[in-house]
């Protein structure tokens, strides 16, 4: 694995799982015909070892090896608390 892991920032939308969070990543995509920028959201499951995140927190997550069927990201830092 490279020493520069891919990182993303997003908002925690669920922390109901043990040691896991769901993060919503927003991006803007240009419409192919009309050219207007549209918001698109991706939901990613991430590993939160200490259960420190709450819903509404803005967090940074980094890519890691697969931890389960749906988790291959881990919490890097909490940017802002809700």
From Swiss-Prot:
Keywords: Ribonucleoprotein, Ribosomal protein, RNA-binding, rRNA-binding. It holds the Pfam family Ribosomal_S17. InterPro entries: NA-bd_OB-fold (IPR012340), Ribosomal_uS17 (IPR000266), Ribosomal_uS17_bact/chlr (IPR019984), Ribosomal_uS17_CS (IPR019979). GO terms for molecular function: rRNA binding; structural constituent of ribosome. The keyword Zinc-finger does not apply. GO terms for biological process: translation. Signal peptide: none annotated. One of its GO terms (cellular component) is cytosolic small ribosomal subunit. The keyword rRNA-binding applies. Belongs to the universal ribosomal protein uS17 family. One of the primary rRNA binding proteins, it binds specifically to the 5'-end of 16S ribosomal RNA. Part of the 30S ribosomal subunit. This is Small ribosomal subunit protein uS17. The gene is rpsQ.
């Amino acid at each position: 694995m490279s020493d520069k892991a891919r990182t993303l920032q997003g908002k925690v939308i669920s922390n109901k799982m043990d040691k896991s969070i769901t993060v919503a990543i927003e991006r803007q995509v240009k419409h192919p015909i009309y050219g207007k920028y549209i918001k698109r959201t991706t939901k990613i499951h991430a590993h939160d070892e200490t259960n420190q995140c709450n819903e509404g927190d803005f967090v940074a997550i980094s890519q890691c090896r697969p931890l389960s069927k749906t988790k291959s990201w881990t919490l890097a830092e909490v940017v802002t608390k809700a």
